[in-house]
Amino acid sequence: LAKNDGFGTIEKLSDDPLTVKYTIAEGVQWSDETPLDAADMLLQWAAESGVFNEGEVTYDEESGAIIPGADVYFDAAALGTGISNVTQVPEIGDDGRSVTFVYDSPYVDWELAFTSPYVPAHVVAMHALNIDDATEAKDAVLAAIQDGDTAALKPMADFWNSGFDYADLPDDPSLYLASGPYVISDLSSSEAYITLTANENYVGDLDPKVETITVRYNEDPLAQVQALQNGELDIINPQATADVITALEGVDGVTVATGVEGTYEHVDLVYNNGGPFDPATYGGDEDTARLVRQAFLLTIPRQEVIDKIIAPLNPDAEVRNSQTRVPGSPGYDDIVESNGSDFYAEVDIAKAQELLAEAGVETPVDVTMLYGKSNIRRASEYQLYAESASDAGFNLIDGGDDEWGSLLGSGTYDTSLFGWQSTGLGVSESAATFRSDGGNNLTGYANDEIDG
């Protein structure tokens, strides 16, 4: 864990109850020179803890964006993680630069539970409550949270959810403030790039070494190679395929670095969209839905994906049988022995057909798969999955979309194919994915035992 004391510090004050103090370093500010302080941290706690969330939340089926309701609801990805374990309003100290969390129960990842504020509290309140002065806006945030004023929290939550959702550089510079070494200076959805410029008002220890950085996005790795060859880019990080490696070998003056990383391809099934894996489709019959899910998993040709797509790049690659541990890491073998992954270890078309027959569903069963359409590897995987699924009685519908990321969790597909990165240091980082209230739970999976 690399600490950044130039931004702030974390101090554990007590084990029982677990009490942790988070302090912002003196002088740290947003790029508009407004101090970054307890108001920003308290707003982030309010959003990520879910303490003030009420009612049910609904999302737009096409965009996946949250639809504002009548109640307070912060749509934070961190819901269900460690901050949810802090239910009392944190105490402010150090002249407004610190907040102290008292956890309801012990939490092993307390050093990782709270990140630096990424949304300026004064901007949220200025827009949501029509306040012109930054200091007055911060005071309004503090008062609303400390008093539990839902009338003020409701518009702030709505703006927190959607006010910073843009694809091109906004006319209002308050919407792209930064507290780090760089600030956004240009953003284009049509040309798929973002430009970062050194933040002239940055206060901290991580002074920028390059004045301007432009990052371009392209789902097609071969197009990235072409842009590098044309001199349009200085560095690329394409998803590796045999074709990409071959293409890079033909580019003069380029250094190619390859290696193994913690990303793994995975297929998720959606439990709550009225589709083939949702019990609601069968009148609430969970057993039928489970049989259909099991049948589908038995068609996933994981080893064939390794052999045909991954092995040409990494002959030592192997299937991964745990969502929480990488092969070779401590505890991996023990987890695999008991997590049920042996059920779908091998493709078994005959067994899949038996399960569908037992479920009593009409075949072929339509299943829509979401993936990055221009991503060569994912498109190749989809073809392998579709061929195998059809043998068992599934019709795997091509739901490839280059905007796949924004569609995750929208319920507009039945299964998804993308990559997770195992880069976090947290012991409990999977909670956000597998708890029913987890902000990263994109499938609708719910299990009382997991929720605790």
Regions found by a protein language model. Name each.
Residues L1, G6, W110-H122, D268, ...:
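A structural "hinge/loop" feature
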Residues K21-T23, E61-F159:
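Surface-exposed binding/hinge segments that line
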Residues T58, P312-S322:
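Short, glycine/acidic-rich hinge or "gate" loops at secondary-structure transitions
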Residues Q29-S31, P106-W110, D316:
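Primarily extracytoplasmic ectodomains and periplasmic/lumenal surface modules that are beta-strand-rich
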